[in-house]
From Swiss-Prot:
GO annotation terms (biological process): 3'-UTR-mediated mRNA destabilization; 3'-UTR-mediated mRNA stabilization; cellular response to epidermal growth factor stimulus; cellular response to fibroblast growth factor stimulus; cellular response to glucocorticoid stimulus; cellular response to granulocyte macrophage colony-stimulating factor stimulus; cellular response to lipopolysaccharide; cellular response to tumor necrosis factor
Function recorded in the entry: Zinc-finger RNA-binding protein that destabilizes several cytoplasmic AU-rich element (ARE)-containing mRNA transcripts by promoting their poly(A) tail removal or deadenylation, and hence provide a mechanism for attenuating protein synthesis. Acts as an 3'-untranslated region (UTR) ARE mRNA-binding adapter protein to communicate signaling events to the mRNA decay machinery. Recruits deadenylase CNOT7 (and probably the CCR4-NOT complex) via association with CNOT1, and hence promotes ARE-mediated mRNA deadenylation.
Organism: Homo sapiens
Protein name: mRNA decay activator protein ZFP36
Compartment annotation: Nucleus; Cytoplasm; Cytoplasmic granule; Cytoplasm, P-body
Residues covered by region (Necessary and sufficient for the association with mRNA decay enzymes and mRNA decay activation): 1-100
Induction note: Up-regulated by T cell activation. Up-regulated in keratinocytes in response to wounding. Up-regulated by lipopolysaccharide (LPS) in a p38 MAPK- and ERK-dependent manner (at protein level). Up-regulated strongly during epidermal repair after wounding in keratinocytes. Up-regulated strongly by epidermal growth factor (EGF) and tumor necrosis factor (TNF-alpha) in keratinocytes. Up-regulated moderately by granulocyte macrophage colony-stimulating factor (GM-CSF) and fibroblast growth factor (FGF1) in keratinocytes. Up-regulated also by glucocorticoid dexamethasone in keratinocytes.
P-P-P-P-G repeat feature ranges: 71-75, 198-202, 219-223
Length: 326
């Protein structure tokens, strides 16, 4: 069976679709007119007719026509005109709200100070003269502590903007409270590793002896420092070692006699070390309990107290037992 005959028989079943003829024309099925709903008029076949059937929006998109004002439907109020990009307020316009920086007019303008004029004029963020200079809102501890980088390395990357003290004139601490000396003195009398600010003028005086302080001692308050040189240095003719006037009874007692009593500092008594007590285990036990094996100066009275008469040194109980047993 020919495929063309099958196709024509299928088309004849539908009365709406025209059946193509062998001559290239179209013929309608019996009972239907030539003018149907799908038939095209001669005017519609022209390109101008196709363009006229397109809606207005499609025409504006294709041909670039601007769509004018469209009236609202009946019963609706007209819409407000939309602002274009040129009418919308920009964030950089003068009417926009801007927050003033916290450092506004808190520093002098370097250009104005050097040349007497500034190209920014009234819009400059820095002060043009002392009349425009404002006081900045600082932290309560601003410029009250030393800058560690400046005193350890000799320089600070922040410079004048640093919040810590670089020079003594920058100290903004409350008056009446003297600065606390955070300097620990080592056994040799020299300051420990880190540098600190120089002492106030009231503390300038004779240098302290190398063995006046223990390794962990700290300087006393400024009010307790007498500035008398006699409190720090002994007289040239004063002997540093005074022996016990009482006769010694044995060599161990002679070795155990206190080494020295510092004359000018009556409260500082150098205690004998463990090695000076001989080789008796009992002596080591008693000396360890009473002395702790310390060879450093002992603070009994005030270190900076005025000179007091030197009292005779007292003997340890171990020596009394040795003398009684002999």
């Amino acid at each position: 069976m020919d495929l063309t005959a099958i196709y024509e028989s299928l088309l004849s079943l539908s009365p709406d679709v025209p059946v193509p003829s062998d001559h290239g024309g179209t013929e309608s099925s019996p009972g239907w007119g030539s003018s149907g709903p799908w038939s095209l008029s001669p005017s519609d076949s022209s390109p101008s007719g196709v363009t006229s059937r397109l809606p207005g929006r499609s025409t504006s998109l294709v041909e670039g026509r601007s769509c004018g004002w469209v009236p609202p439907p009946p019963g609706f109020a007209p819409l407000a005109p939309r602002l274009g990009p040129e009418l919308s307020p920009s964030p950089t316009s003068p009417t926009a709200t801007s927050t003033t920086p916290s450092r506004y007019k808190t520093e002098l303008c370097r250009t104005f100070s050097e040349s007497g004029r500034c190209r920014y004029g009234a819009k400059c963020q820095f002060a043009h003269g002392l009349g425009e200079l404002r006081q900045a809102n600082r932290h309560p501890k601003y410029k009250t502590e030393l800058c560690h980088k400046f005193y350890l390395q000799g320089r600070c990357p922040y410079g004048s903007r640093c919040h810590f003290i670089h020079n003594p004139s920058e100290d903004l601490a409350a008056p009446g409270h003297p600065p606390v000396l955070r300097q620990s003195i080592s056994f040799s009398g020299l300051p420990s590793g880190r540098r600190t600010s120089p002492p106030p003028p009231g503390l300038a005086g004779p240098s302290l002896s190398s063995s006046s302080f223990s390794p962990s001692s700290s300087p006393p308050p400024p009010g307790d420092l007498p500035l008398s040189p006699s409190a720090f240095s002994a007289a040239p003719g004063t002997p540093l070692a005074r022996r016990d006037p009482t006769p010694v009874c044995c060599p161990s007692c002679r070795r155990a006699t206190p080494i020295s009593v510092w004359g000018p500092l009556g409260g500082l008594v150098r205690t004998p070390s463990v090695q000076s007590l001989g080789s008796d285990p009992d002596e080591y036990a008693s000396s360890g309990s009473s002395l702790g094996g310390s060879d450093s100066p002992v603070f009994e009275a005030g270190v900076f107290a005025p000179p007091q008469p030197v009292a005779a040194p007292r003997r340890l109980p171990i020596f009394n037992r040795i003398s009684v047993s002999e």
